[in-house]
């Protein structure tokens, strides 16, 4: 069985948070209904996957893994999957080969995770998403599929009531987004885990629902995340730089991402941080960790809300 890619584990320092403001009562759902939808991927080169026009993976995603869909969907219904393949930067490639494209295998499916035993139950990935490969090598490859979700036991508001940010003046929007990131940078660099928790409260609440967390799991994650921010981020954030603004979810979500490829970073090689959030803290000896935030602007409001990673 392939390794399940739990985003909240891979990005532990970036995970959900809640404390004493805006908490909600977590409704417990029976184990047999705790469905997590996913895309099972086998590939020999890095790829990027989008779910409902939201980037769900990075180029450094482990090969041969699975991507959870729950963070990127709000309710049952049609879900759009998009695959992108670029030439391999670290190898100096300029084309994506037909062979590499054809060796990408994607399957849609679901599973249930028993958190008490850490067992993966009812794992099935039996709906193939067939690749239509070109006849010659190409500078870039992209393909989309639609899948249907029918068994989610919840419905979330998420970014559904957000403004269409495509209608904003791009320069004005970017100025506003950068100002918000600067505020987040200072919070992280000061090690203010409590303030981070308050700003990510809505994300925390919805994460608890789509990952079927118990009250205890939720509070433990919040506590650990605050401690990690205090321990690892204080006076350890790199400058906020080399970024570009990205819109997702058909203009409902916005973020900043690093725009330049790297072959190494902070004494770790290879490490390509293109596409990362620019909210980056250096590792103690090498490498780095980053703090993803996807923002939306509620209708009738002028204040961003952090809703996903």
PLM region spans:
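Sec-dependent N-terminal signal peptides
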Residues: 4-13
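Beta-strand-rich recognition domains
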Residues: 19-47, 84-190, 194, 199-214, ...
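Short strand-turn-strand beta-turns centered on an Asx-Gly dipeptide
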Residues: 46-62
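A short, sequence-level motif marking secondary-structure junctions
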Residues: 61-65, 129-130
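A glycine-anchored, Pro-Gly-centered beta-turn/N-cap motif
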Residues: 64, 70-77
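Short, well-structured beta-strand segments within conserved domains
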Residues: 74-86
């Amino acid at each position: 069985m392939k390794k399940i890619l739990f985003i909240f584990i891979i990005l532990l320092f970036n995970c959900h948070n809640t404390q004493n403001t805006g908490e909600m009562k977590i409704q417990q759902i029976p184990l047999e209904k705790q469905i997590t939808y996913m895309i099972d991927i086998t590939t020999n080169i890095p790829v990027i996957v989008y779910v409902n026009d939201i980037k769900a993976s990075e180029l450094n995603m482990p090969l041969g893994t699975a991507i959870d869909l729950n963070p990127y969907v709000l309710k049952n219904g049609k879900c759009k999957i998009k695959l992108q393949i670029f030439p391999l930067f670290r190898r100096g490639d300029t084309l994506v080969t037909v062979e590499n494209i054809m060796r990408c295998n994607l399957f849609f499916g679901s599973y249930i995770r028993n958190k008490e035993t850490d067992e993966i139950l009812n794992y099935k990935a039996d709906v193939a998403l067939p690749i239509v490969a070109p006849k010659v090598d190409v500078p870039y490859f992209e393909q989309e599929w639609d899948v249907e979700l029918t068994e989610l036991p919840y419905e979330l508001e998420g970014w559904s009531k957000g403004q269409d940010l495509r209608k904003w003046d791009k320069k004005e929007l970017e100025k506003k987004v950068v100002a918000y990131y600067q505020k987040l940078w200072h919070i992280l660099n000061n090690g203010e885990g409590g303030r981070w928790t308050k700003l990510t409260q809505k994300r925390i609440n919805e994460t608890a629902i789509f990952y079927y967390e118990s009250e205890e799991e939720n509070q433990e994650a919040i506590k650990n995340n605050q401690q990690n921010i205090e321990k690892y981020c204080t006076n350890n954030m790199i400058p906020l730089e080399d970024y570009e603004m990205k819109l997702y979810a058909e203009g409902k979500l916005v973020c900043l991402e690093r725009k330049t490829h790297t072959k190494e970073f902070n004494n770790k090689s290879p490490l390509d941080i293109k596409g990362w959030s620019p909210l980056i803290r250096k590792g103690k000896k090498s490498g780095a960790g980053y703090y993803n935030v996807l923002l939306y602007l509620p209708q009738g409001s002028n204040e961003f809300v952090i809703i996903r990673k």
